[in-house]
């Protein structure tokens, strides 16, 4: 029976490792001669250069097929969503409640409105132009600076009594609060057939708490008639219109009953806007519960 191989000592193992790192007899470093290391390095360098070039070529060809001014994928909704400011979400949608006599209960709501309208100051709209045509503002060319399209100004003062400039409390202090309604953007969307879309806010019966003694909701709209002027449409996308600002409509509720919760729905009335989608409660309208305590 052959004798067991003698175990190598630590010094022997270190000597073999040093010889593997550099063998002076054969001129090899890590098992290869310097010339072979050069050829291997050149091969991998060329390989990765070619792979990087092919990848860049694929990206270039892909980018040539994409229109930078039109999104490839858009929401399947035919109508824009509608948002509300101030927006306070409860367990079941928008729920806004405050006490007239407690400033702290509505200070946060007015702060939200002031912050939101900060983007509608004249200074923030200086790159936009004044529009008054009340007709669709079609733009076939990129005539604005930096190869963009013009955007129409919308400043907070157009909301008049609900601008926060005349009444910093937006009517919350007197129990006649202002709410701002905004339509979400859809590229090249035309809301109606040459008729400005308008906002219509009404009381709506709560299925769980029906009421028959409530009077119709009285509303003051700003701009007048609660319309979104047509010259803000169509929207051509963020790249084409980097300075675009959504038009707004403010609704000031004048006769909300105190110490009771009411359900209010604000709909966009336009030919091409629908608000009866059971799968999306914010398509074409916004619903919210409002409680004003006294």
Curated annotation (Swiss-Prot):
The C-terminal lobe folds into an immunoglobulin-like domain and mediates cell adhesion properties. The beta subunit of the gastric H(+)/K(+) ATPase pump which transports H(+) ions in exchange for K(+) ions across the apical membrane of parietal cells. Plays a structural and regulatory role in the assembly and membrane targeting of a functionally active pump. Within a transport cycle, the transfer of a H(+) ion across the membrane is coupled to ATP hydrolysis and is associated with a transient phosphorylation of the alpha subunit that shifts the pump conformation from inward-facing (E1) to outward-facing state (E2). Belongs to the X(+)/potassium ATPases subunit beta family. Disulfide bonds join 131-152, 162-178, 201-266. The gene is Atp4b. This is Potassium-transporting ATPase subunit beta. One of its GO terms (molecular function) is ATPase activator activity. It holds the Pfam family Na_K-ATPase. InterPro entries: Na/K_ATPase_sub_beta, Na/K_ATPase_sub_beta_sf. Gene3D superfamilies: 1.20.5.170, Na, k-atpase alpha subunit. It is a single-pass type II membrane protein. Stomach. Keywords: Cell adhesion, Cell membrane, Disulfide bond, Glycoprotein, Hydrogen ion transport, Ion transport, Membrane, Potassium, Potassium transport, Signal-anchor, Transmembrane, Transmembrane helix, Transport. Glycans are attached at residues 99, 103, 130, 146, 161, 193, 225. GO terms for cellular component: apical plasma membrane; potassium:proton exchanging ATPase complex; sodium:potassium-exchanging ATPase complex. N-glycosylation is necessary for assembly and functional expression of the pump at the plasma membrane. NCBIfam families: Na_K_ATPase_bet (TIGR01107). The chain crosses the membrane at residues 37-57. Residues 194-294 are annotated as: immunoglobulin-like. It comes from the Eukaryota. It is found in: Apical cell membrane; Cell membrane. It comes from Rattus norvegicus. The lineage of its organism: Eukaryota, Metazoa, Chordata, Craniata, Vertebrata. The ATPase pump is composed of two subunits: alpha (catalytic) and beta (regulatory). Interacts with alpha subunit ATP12A; this interaction is required for the formation of a functionally active pump and targeting at the plasma membrane. Interacts (via N-terminus) with alpha subunit ATP4A (via the P-domain).
């Amino acid at each position: 029976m052959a004798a067991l191989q003698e175990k190598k000592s630590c010094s022997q193992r270190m000597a073999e490792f040093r010889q593997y790192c550099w063998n002076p007899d054969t001129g090899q470093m890590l098992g290869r001669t310097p010339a072979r290391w050069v050829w291997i390095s050149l091969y991998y360098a060329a390989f990765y250069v070619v792979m990087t070039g092919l990848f860049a070529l694929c990206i270039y060809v892909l980018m040539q097929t994409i229109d930078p001014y039109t999104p490839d994928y858009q929401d399947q909704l035919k109508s824009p969503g509608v948002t509300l400011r101030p927006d306070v979400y409860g367990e079941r949608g928008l729920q806004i409640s405050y006490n007239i006599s407690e400033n702290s209960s509505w200070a946060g709501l007015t702060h939200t409105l002031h912050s939101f309208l900060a983007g509608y100051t004249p200074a923030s709209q200086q790159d936009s132009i004044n529009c008054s045509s009340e007709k669709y503002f079609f733009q076939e060319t990129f005539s604005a600076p930096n190869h963009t399209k013009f955007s129409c100004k919308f400043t907070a003062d157009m909301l008049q009594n609900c601008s926060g400039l005349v009444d910093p409390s937006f009517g919350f202090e007197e129990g006649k609060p202002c709410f701002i309604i905004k339509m979400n953007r859809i590229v090249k969307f035309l809301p109606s057939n040459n008729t400005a879309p308008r906002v219509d806010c009404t009381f709506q019966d709560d299925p769980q708490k029906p009421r028959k003694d409530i009077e119709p909701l009285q509303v003051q709209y700003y701009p007048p008639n609660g319309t979104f002027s047509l010259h803000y449409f169509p929207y051509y996308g963020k790249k084409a219109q980097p300075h675009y600002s959504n038009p707004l409509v403010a609704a000031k509720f004048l006769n909300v009953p105190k110490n009771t919760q009411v359900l209010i729905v604000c709909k966009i009335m336009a030919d091409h806007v629908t608000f009866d989608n059971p799968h999306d409660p914010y398509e074409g309208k916004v619903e919210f519960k409002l409680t004003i305590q006294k």
